[in-house]
From Swiss-Prot:
Gene Ontology molecular functions: fumarate transmembrane transporter activity; malate:proton symporter activity; succinate transmembrane transporter activity
Organism: Cupriavidus metallidurans (strain ATCC 43123 / DSM 2839 / NBRC 102507 / CH34) (Ralstonia metallidurans)
Record has Methyltransferase as a keyword: no
Chain segments annotated as transmembrane: 14-34, 49-69, 81-101, 149-169, 189-209, 227-247, 294-314, 336-356, 357-377
The protein's name in its UniProt record: C4-dicarboxylate transport protein 2
HAMAP family attached to this UniProt entry: C4_dicarb_transport
Cellular-component GO terms for this entry: plasma membrane
Keywords, sorted A to Z: Cell inner membrane, Cell membrane, Membrane, Plasmid, Symport, Transmembrane, Transmembrane helix, Transport
């Protein structure tokens, strides 16, 4: 029988549409800067649409994943292994950034006097209360009310409530089936909405890129270009050497994985926010063969604790400012910087500008590097945010697959099949593919039913 070709025409693929949108945005922003800046609402509107759906998707995914598990001990094991992975790999990212910036030294010879820098532009990032302390950060994980957590879209707060709800629903056994089925069906509705939102992703990427080029100009890319080139190169080394090695040790190719999430990467490239594809990334990973409970726990947590691109940026930017302002940093001072960053880097979120806020807080905490030096990189920070967001996204995707492999929640055969023989429908509409699968409550435990 003749094989039917289900491939879409190129012009209908999200991959092609986003590429065209990004190029169009660059052209408009470069030749018509005022018009480019006016496109900002398109990018902002797209990200707001995504943020609108993130909290309920995380809630549904985590609840269904946990309530559907046979062994509750696996939830704690999954969370513990995820945090261990995050700490080790983000530490490697910090060390890699520190190593390369000391080898290349892009700031050496600039001889900038910090007192001559215009610090008005960085005032918004260095004001009081911009960066939480450790205790404040932990307390902020607990919402004032459940409604408040959803209303503000606080990912970790929603995650905490979802985990507790999932445990409680699991304890009900068969009596909780009605609630479980409702939440499971509701999650499919939400992912269908995500599919609708992604139809306008090219418009969002176009607007965000046109605004960036129109406001900051291509010329700002040429200034401080050595730092940008060094940072982008370091991110590539981290992705293909560090993450590539981790992927290979766990049975998959980083090249094939990147190809699998290419649409998400292009959207992130256009919007500079890895959060813009969080719901779609969850659908993609579940479609890849990762159990729903692992996806629901690892991905949202990773957006606060596993920001590899941001970690690289923080060490490189801090040492670059020291080099440019002729501020000597000996080994002890650099190790102190590293220790502070191990804490402050966990306070960044997957949104545009968070890395700059964390950097400002870190320089203030260390005290050795002049905070005024932030003005040096303010103009190009927006352009480096693309590499940060892309690296963060790939890092969280790899982390989810690895943790799933460790806990036995990864369908290896399905993953290999998806990475090798992905169809256009799976690439463009993972939300639709999920509708072909179903999750069920575990078998009723009579003892649990009697206790309830």
């Amino acid at each position: 029988m003749e094989k039917v070709d289900n491939r879409k025409p190129l012009y209908r693929s999200l991959y092609f549409q986003v590429i065209v949108a990004i190029i169009s945005g660059v052209v408009l922003g470069h030749y018509y800067p005022t018009a480019g800046e006016a496109m900002k609402p398109l990018g902002d509107g797209f990200i707001k649409l995504i943020k609108m759906i993130i909290a309920p998707i995380i809630f549904c995914t985590v609840v269904v994943g946990i309530a559907g598990m046979e062994d509750m001990k696996k939830v704690g094991k999954t969370g513990g292994l995820a945090l261990l992975y995050f700490e080790v790999v983000s530490s490697i990212a910090l060390l890699l950034g520190l190593l390369i910036i000391n080898i290349v030294k892009p700031g050496a010879g600039m001889n900038v006097d910090p007192s001559t820098l215009d610090t008005k532009g960085i005032a918004a990032y260095t004001g009081p209360g911009k960066m939480q302390g450790t205790v404040d950060f932990l307390m902020n994980v607990i919402p004032n009310t459940v409604v408040d957590a959803f209303a503000k879209g606080e990912i970790l707060q929603v995650l905490l409530f979802a985990v507790m709800f999932g445990f409680a629903l699991h304890k009900f056994g068969g009596r909780g089936t009605l609630v479980f089925d409702f939440i499971e069906k509701f999650s499919h509705v939400l992912f269908t909405i995500v599919g609708y939102i992604m139809k306008v992703a090219p418009l969002g990427a176009f607007g965000a890129m046109a605004f960036t080029i129109g406001k900051y100009g291509v010329s700002s890319l040429l200034q401080l270009g050595q730092l940008m080139a060094t940072f982008y190169a370091t991110c590539l080394v981290f992705i293909f050497v560090v993450l590539g090695t981790i992927a290979r040790l766990h049975g998959f190719s980083i090249w094939k994985f990147i190809k699998y999430i290419k649409e998400e990467l292009l959207i992130v490239l256009g919007t500079s926010s890895s959060e813009s594809v969080l719901p779609r990334m969850m659908a993609k990973l579940e479609n890849l063969g990762v159990r729903k409970s692992v996806v629901g726990l690892v991905i949202p947590t990773g957006y606060s604790f596993n920001l590899d691109g941001t970690s690289i940026y923080l060490t490189m930017a801090a040492v670059f400012i020291a080099q440019a302002t002729n501020t000597d940093m000996n080994l002890t001072q650099q190790l102190t910087l590293l220790a502070v960053l191990l804490l402050t880097s966990k306070g960044a979120a997957g949104v545009t500008g968070s890395g700059f806020i964390v950097l400002a807080a870190t320089l203030s905490a260390v005290g050795h590097v002049p905070v005024a030096g932030l003005a040096l990189i303010l103009g190009i920070d927006r352009f480096m945010s693309e590499a940060r967001a892309l690296t963060n996204l790939i890092g969280n995707g790899v982390a989810t697959v690895v943790v799933a492999k460790w806990t036995g929640d990864l369908d290896l055969e399905r993953m290999r099949r998806r990475l090798d023989d992905e169809t256009d429908s799976e690439a463009d509409e993972p939300e639709m593919v999920l509708d072909q699968t179903a999750t069920h409550m575990p078998a009723v435990d009579p003892a649990v039913t009697r206790r309830g």
